């Protein structure tokens, strides 16, 4: 089978390509230029070229920087301006990697596209679903909630049945040169963030703009450094007069540049809504497991569709829901879709 492999210049994607080559597949390597850091691209393209030369496969470099900027990067900035906590990876995957890159791979005559994601594909009644990775500590299915069944059917995740701790030894044994590759340390798993998301925002908007902190009764009780520097649940970086116990951000008013803070129990919610839904065609209202942020523990909840929105009711109090994050719905370890929390 002819398969396109997205190569990032790192160990995981390189070993994914090696695994598929060992299985006898015909491969085409693809490197995506998404963010605007040419210094990073130069290094990672060089790394990807080394992997392709070792495997004896061609490498194509696709420049999607303009598309990425308008569809992902600019949306990231806008979301923070609106007081939300965006999830750019969940937006990038369906539009870039499994959108534009997949389309290109199909034009090359490839039947499928592979990546180093920690996830799996499972066919149920001739329909393809995303399944959680074997390694639950590294599972990335959360970021794949917006993919259509027809797209999922064209995906391959060679690392999905492996444990992260085993991959580097396997990769170095198979491809010794991987141990000599230079890389940049990524922050928060967001490819275009150098040190922190705040540094990225500072390039485009006024981040350090002092404002007031209010309690749930609307009383001014302190100050903060600028609302974009905070997310729901944060407990540091702002002042609260006479506070004897920790206070947490429970709300953000972007228009007024105000934070609303409260105690930990004030972070609790029993329901939430999500828009821009992407759910399986056969989805039925009922009890499922949900995640409202990456790396959170799956939580039981009743999920229903109403007026094109996803509505969730929790059995137990759920803490720290942030607008802009992905709400993802699972049945056991099978991904059924999700939406953006509002």
Curated annotation (Swiss-Prot):
ATP binds at residues 6-13, 32, 116. InterPro entries: MnmA-like (IPR004506), MnmA-like_C (IPR046885), MnmA-like_central (IPR046884), MnmA-like_central_sf (IPR023382), Rossmann-like_a/b/a_fold (IPR014729). It is found in: Cytoplasm. The record marks 117, 325 as: Interaction with tRNA. The active site is at residues 92, 191. Pfam families: tRNA_Me_trans, tRNA_Me_trans_C, tRNA_Me_trans_M. Keywords: ATP-binding, Cytoplasm, Disulfide bond, Nucleotide-binding, RNA-binding, Transferase, tRNA processing, tRNA-binding. Residues 138-140, 293-294 are annotated as: Interaction with tRNA. GO terms for cellular component: cytoplasm. Signal peptide: none annotated. Its main location: cytoplasm. One of its GO terms (biological process) is tRNA wobble position uridine thiolation. CDD domains: MnmA_TRMU-like. The keyword Ligase does not apply. Disulfide bonds join 92-191. One of its GO terms (molecular function) is ATP binding. It is an enzyme of class 2 (transferase). Gene3D superfamilies: Adenine nucleotide alpha hydrolases-like domains, HUPs, Translation factors. It catalyses: S-sulfanyl-L-cysteinyl-[protein] + uridine(34) in tRNA + AH2 + ATP = 2-thiouridine(34) in tRNA + L-cysteinyl-[protein] + A + AMP + diphosphate + H(+). HAMAP family: tRNA_thiouridyl_MnmA. Catalyzes the 2-thiolation of uridine at the wobble position (U34) of tRNA, leading to the formation of s(2)U34. NCBIfam families: PRK00143.1 (NF001138), trmU (TIGR00420). This is tRNA-specific 2-thiouridylase MnmA. It comes from Helicobacter pylori (strain Shi470). The gene is mnmA.
């Amino acid at each position: 089978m002819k398969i396109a492999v997205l190569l990032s210049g790192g160990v995981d994607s390189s070993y994914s390509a090696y695994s598929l080559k060992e299985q006898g597949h015909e491969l085409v390597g693809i490197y995506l230029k998404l963010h605007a850091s040419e210094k990073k691209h130069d290094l990672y393209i060089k790394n990807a070229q080394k992997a392709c030369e070792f495997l004896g496969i061609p490498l194509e470099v696709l420049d999607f920087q303009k598309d990425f900027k308008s569809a992902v990067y600019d949306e990231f900035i806008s979301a923070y301006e609106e007081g939300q906590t965006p999830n750019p990876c969940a937006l990038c995957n369906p539009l870039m990697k499994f959108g534009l890159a997949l389309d290109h791979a199909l034009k090359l005559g490839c039947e499928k596209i592979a990546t180093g994601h920690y996830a799996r594909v499972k066919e149920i009644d001739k329909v393809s679903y995303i399944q959680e990775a074997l390694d639950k500590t590294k599972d990335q299915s959360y970021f794949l909630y917006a993919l259509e069944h027809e797209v999922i059917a064209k995906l391959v995740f060679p690392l999905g049945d492996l444990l992260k701790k085993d991959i580097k030894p396997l990769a170095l044994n198979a491809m010794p040169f991987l141990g000599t590759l230079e890389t940049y340390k990524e922050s928060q798993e967001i490819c275009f963030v150098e040190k922190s998301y705040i540094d990225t925002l500072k390039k485009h908007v006024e981040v350090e703009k002092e404002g007031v902190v209010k309690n749930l009764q609307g009383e001014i009780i302190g100050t903060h450094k600028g609302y974009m520097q905070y997310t729901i649940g944060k407990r540091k970086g702002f002042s609260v007069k006479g506070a004897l116990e920790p206070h947490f951000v429970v709300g953000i008013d972007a228009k007024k540049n105000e934070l609303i803070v409260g105690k930990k129990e004030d972070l609790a919610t029993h329901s939430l809504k999500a828009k821009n839904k992407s759910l399986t065609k056969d989805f039925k209202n009922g009890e499922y497991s949900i995640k409202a942020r990456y790396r959170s523990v799956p939580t039981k909840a009743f999920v229903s569709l109403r007026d094109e929105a996803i509505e969730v009711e929790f059995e137990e109090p759920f803490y720290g829901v942030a607008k802009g994050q992905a709400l993802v719905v699972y049945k056991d370890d099978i991904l059924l879709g999700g939406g953006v929390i509002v």
